[in-house]
């Protein structure tokens, strides 16, 4: 801290807010520090160090901190430390987690596992507990805020839900005091201290000290002699900050703490009365107003039997013991905070892995091509809770080439999603016919800020009904398009085998369905599809009744009763890049089955 006052441009702090982030995501944070934050050619965050004329990535600064911790631990243990368990905020996204892991590698460490800070805290508190308990972990640190709900018992630590805000923490409380002091000084003296980096750093240090004092005292005396100077001489700040005034300065931030708590309980399908323990983690939870908020919301006195500054590290040590085999009978089950899926036809998102899915997890779906002769597919991986692509975040995209030309719906492409125990996502697409594979590990994509995550979740609830209605329109149209395509294809292939009266009826209903699709009214499309399906059933019946036809007359109808909808997936406007997922048979496909039986 002394260095930050005398050498503010070359002293780095609160680097955690920049790790794994793009510059466009940290514009506000970059203005709150005394050192210079710049962007490189890829819009990545760099921290400028004028003393040595070099720019550092946030991972490099974090690595230096880790290296110092490793050196201290090695001296204490009298043994070399080469492996570690590293904790991160629960709402860290994929890029932030990967960047944290990179920092460990830069520091010469093998990072065995990345675990969420609230989860680590529960390990420290719940160690050796035998009774089943439901725990809420309220983790408010210097730069981030996390809430997790867990079930703990018999050595199993299962995370039920997690929520948070990666733009909220003790630094924000400090800034309110800094702004108050600077505003008062500017009003009285006409000088903006925020433009003086050395003065800004002194204000920040003093604000943090005052905040800490107000955790135990009702007022704090602030003295900053020689904060600046004018032609009239040196200027000083001498004032008093009461606890009541401090709480008034950041009352809106206190309100922001409520939402993640409420969200985490709702996602876990629990109420406050279901909680057995409430654990406070992080130095900022010492603030009386924060403690009082937790008491009022949960109706329980928080458990503070473990030092909130040390509890996460203790939990990480327990997890390290589990991985090393020194601690047994403990199982840790964490979750992913956001849903993962693909872009689908009509600009909708199809979720493959829902939010709060237990990690590690792996899920796959089989798709096919959406156009005849299609030789490639492009897959856009999304993160978020809304129904439509435009309201979610694109994590990255990749293309699978070399698919042999074939009729629409024939090739099979398996798309597999894997999220490891560290919460890092990888996606693989395999053409099952040729064995060709393409994959992507989501590490370099622009990251998703925590407040944007909360916005996504809240908007998903707010617009759920509207989104569902729009989604139904698109899904119905997609299904109708598929029915039209398949029916026309079969009529063409069957040719003169179809009796003229039957063919005319099918073509008439086809025309009605096309008109309904153009009209865009969901119910009209459904009615037209049902009418067409009836005529297609009659077509199938007429084929069975022809001499030489095989199978039972009722076979097509029985199969028809099992039909469901079809889904299509696309990445680009070019139909050659579209993916088609068939989950059932349409009525027109039944005709193809009838024809095959005739042969």
Curated annotation (Swiss-Prot):
<keyword id="KW-0547">Nucleotide-binding</keyword>
<keyword id="KW-0346">Stress response</keyword>
<dbReference type="GO" id="GO:0009507">
    <property type="term" value="C:chloroplast"/>
</dbReference>
<dbReference type="InterPro" id="IPR029048">
    <property type="entry name" value="HSP70_C_sf"/>
</dbReference>
<dbReference type="GO" id="GO:0016887">
    <property type="term" value="F:ATP hydrolysis activity"/>
</dbReference>
<comment type="similarity">
    <text>Belongs to the heat shock protein 70 family.</text>
</comment>
<keyword id="KW-0150">Chloroplast</keyword>
<dbReference type="GO" id="GO:0009570">
    <property type="term" value="C:chloroplast stroma"/>
</dbReference>
<dbReference type="InterPro" id="IPR018181">
    <property type="entry name" value="Heat_shock_70_CS"/>
</dbReference>
<dbReference type="GO" id="GO:0051085">
    <property type="term" value="P:chaperone cofactor-dependent protein refolding"/>
</dbReference>
<dbReference type="GO" id="GO:0051082">
    <property type="term" value="F:unfolded protein binding"/>
</dbReference>
<protein>
    <recommendedName>
        <fullName>Stromal 70 kDa heat shock-related protein, chloroplastic</fullName>
    </recommendedName>
</protein>
<feature type="region of interest" description="Disordered">
    <location>
        <begin position="545"/>
        <end position="573"/>
    </location>
</feature>
<dbReference type="InterPro" id="IPR029047">
    <property type="entry name" value="HSP70_peptide-bd_sf"/>
</dbReference>
<dbReference type="GO" id="GO:0044183">
    <property type="term" value="F:protein folding chaperone"/>
</dbReference>
<feature type="compositionally biased region" description="Low complexity">
    <location>
        <begin position="554"/>
        <end position="568"/>
    </location>
</feature>
<dbReference type="Pfam" id="PF00012">
    <property type="entry name" value="HSP70"/>
</dbReference>
<dbReference type="GO" id="GO:0140662">
    <property type="term" value="F:ATP-dependent protein folding chaperone"/>
</dbReference>
<dbReference type="GO" id="GO:0005524">
    <property type="term" value="F:ATP binding"/>
</dbReference>
<dbReference type="InterPro" id="IPR013126">
    <property type="entry name" value="Hsp_70_fam"/>
</dbReference>
<dbReference type="InterPro" id="IPR043129">
    <property type="entry name" value="ATPase_NBD"/>
</dbReference>
<dbReference type="GO" id="GO:0031072">
    <property type="term" value="F:heat shock protein binding"/>
</dbReference>
<keyword id="KW-0067">ATP-binding</keyword>
<comment type="function">
    <text>Interacts with newly imported chloroplast proteins to assist in their maturation.</text>
</comment>
<dbReference type="GO" id="GO:0042026">
    <property type="term" value="P:protein refolding"/>
</dbReference>
<keyword id="KW-0934">Plastid</keyword>
<dbReference type="InterPro" id="IPR012725">
    <property type="entry name" value="Chaperone_DnaK"/>
</dbReference>
